[in-house]
Swiss-Prot record:
Name of the gene encoding the protein in the UniProt record: vmh3
Disulfide bond sites: C28-C87, C35-C81, C36-C69, C88-C101
Subunit field text: Self-assembles to form functional amyloid fibrils called rodlets. Self-assembly into fibrillar rodlets occurs spontaneously at hydrophobic:hydrophilic interfaces and the rodlets further associate laterally to form amphipathic monolayers.
Record's description of how this protein is used: Vmh3 can be efficiently used in surface modification applications such as antifouling agents, in modifications of biomaterials used as implants, in designing drug delivery systems for water-insoluble drugs, and also in food foams.
Family: Belongs to the fungal hydrophobin family.
Localization per record: Secreted; Secreted, Cell wall
Glycosylated position list: N37
Keyword set includes Disulfide bond: yes
Name under which the protein is recorded: Class I hydrophobin 3
Upper taxonomic lineage: Eukaryota, Fungi, Dikarya, Basidiomycota, Agaricomycotina
Database matches in InterPro entries: Hydrophobin (IPR001338), Hydrophobin_CS (IPR019778)
Disruption phenotype: Alters the cell surface structure and mycelial hydrophobicity. Exhibits relatively slower aerial mycelia formation on a liquid medium and leads to slower growth under stress conditions involving SDS and H(2)O(2). Leads to a marked delay in lignin degradation on beech wood sawdust medium, while the production of lignin-modifying enzymes is not reduced.
Signal peptide residue numbers: 1-17
Pfam families registered for this protein in UniProt: Hydrophobin (PF01185)
């Protein structure tokens, strides 16, 4: 029984410790850092009603799609980002839906 508990705990620790794909360069324009409340993979996004809101070819979308984003600058001194912090320097579309953003690790 102890062995099984140890194995389950080790596997759970490994799952929690697995890193997300983060930016490899440390540069991100501060105006490009956003706090996004919603993220979904591109395939799920393509099937959603939100996909009709963007003026690009849906077939070109890959990776993660972020929405309900607000600038981090607007959060300083107020509430913190309790969702996903992303850098949108190379975003294909920047507005209601953000495509091409990269998750970043920021302690706010």
């Amino acid at each position: 029984m102890f062995f099984q508990t140890t194995i389950v705990a080790a596997l759970a620790s490994l799952a929690v410790a697995t890193p997300l794909a983060l930016r490899t360069d440390s540069r991100c324009n501060t105006e490009s850092v956003k706090c996004c409340n919603k993220s979904e993979d591109a395939e799920t996004f393509k099937k959603s009603a939100s996909a009709a809101l963007i003026p690009i070819k849906i077939g070109d979308i890959t990776g993660e799609v972020y929405s309900e984003c607000s600038p981090i600058v607007g959060l300083i001194g107020g509430s913190s980002c309790s969702a996903q912090t992303v850098c949108c320097d190379n975003a294909k579309f920047n507005g209601l839906v953000n495509i091409g953003c990269t998750p970043i690790n920021v302690a706010l």
